[in-house]
């Protein structure tokens, strides 16, 4: 394990994901869940030439995000705190390197990556700012940080909090939605906003979150094509407060602003 001594939150997270690795991968790595994920990423990355870019898939799990970048010719490195997740990643993407480490202290050299991608900032509470400091350090000047996160102050956030109280099996105590507006404001000296897309309804809940909702994978495969199309249509009219997630793309400033 790279990096310094883990906090109690990180130890709990490592043990948790080591325990549920197989079940997590069964749900999040199925074809329908990946199709949904890749379609979302394409909303932001379609205008960026990813070929030969060095990308860190931070808190990568079994590499659910890596596939999108790998198929576009990027050089991808995975990072996860769970040894079991790293083992799956290594088997799935033998062409890529993977590091078993906390994102809070990666031991990568500064300015190592063109892009850092994560869908797991919400696992970092109360260390989100510390995590962003490390992400900024390892990003090249002008590099991109992209996060796909459940958002706070939304109807979906209320549902998440209800599920947390009712079912502790698939949720950790420190998990919480991300306040995107606050994140952007606190990072304004270091990053500029490039784009932010909001969305998520039927497919996000019943395809992407099938594990949390205890929906068998065989059933997800049956209805997922319809739900993905339906969500794409509903997203056109859905107000932000009804959205489940935000996909936010920030760019590291070439010169740090001190004012």
Q: Can you describe what each PLM-predicted range is?
A:
Residues 62-105:
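Class I SAM-dependent methyltransferase SAM/SAH-binding core
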Residues 1-50, 52-61, 68, 146-169:
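Conserved class I S-adenosyl-L-methionine
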Residues 104-116:
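A short acidic, Gly/Pro-enriched loop at the edge of an enzyme's catalytic core
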Residues 160-164, 195-259:
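A C-terminal cap/extension of S-adenosyl-L-methionine-dependent methyltransferases
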Residues 174-191:
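Short alpha-helix
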Residues 129-141:
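A short glycine-rich, Lys/Arg-flanked "PGG" loop and its adjoining helix->strand segment in the class I
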């Amino acid at each position: 394990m790279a990096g310094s001594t883990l906090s109690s939150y990180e130890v709990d997270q490592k043990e948790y994901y080591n325990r549920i690795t197989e079940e997590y991968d069964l749900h999040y790595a199925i074809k329908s869940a990946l199709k949904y994920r890749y379609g979302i990423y394409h909303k932001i990355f379609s205008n960026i030439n990813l070929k030969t870019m060095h990308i860190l898939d931070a808190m990568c799990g079994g590499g659910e995000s890596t596939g999108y970048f790998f198929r576009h010719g990027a050089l991808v490195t995975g990072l996860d705190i769970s040894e079991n997740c790293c083992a799956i990643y290594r088997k799935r993407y033998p062409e890529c390197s993977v590091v078993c480490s906390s994102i809070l202290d990666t031991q990568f050299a500064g300015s190592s990556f063109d892009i850092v991608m994560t869908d797991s900032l919400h696992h970092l509470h109360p260390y989100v700012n510390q995590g962003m400091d490390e992400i900024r350090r390892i990003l090249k000047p002008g590099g991109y940080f992209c996060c796909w996160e459940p958002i706070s102050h939304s109807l979906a956030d209320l549902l998440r909090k209800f599920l947390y109280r009712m079912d502790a099996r698939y949720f950790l105590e420190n998990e919480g939605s991300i306040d995107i507006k606050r994140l952007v404001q606190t990072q304004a000296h270091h990053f500029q906003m490039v784009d932010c897309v909001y969305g998520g309804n039927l497919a996000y809940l019943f395809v992407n979150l099938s594990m949390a909702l205890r929906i068998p994978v065989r059933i997800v495969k049956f209805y997922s094509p319809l739900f993905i199309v339906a969500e794409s249509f509903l997203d056109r009219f859905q107000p932000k407060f009804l959205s489940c997630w935000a996909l936010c793309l920030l760019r590291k400033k070439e010169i740090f602003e001190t004012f």
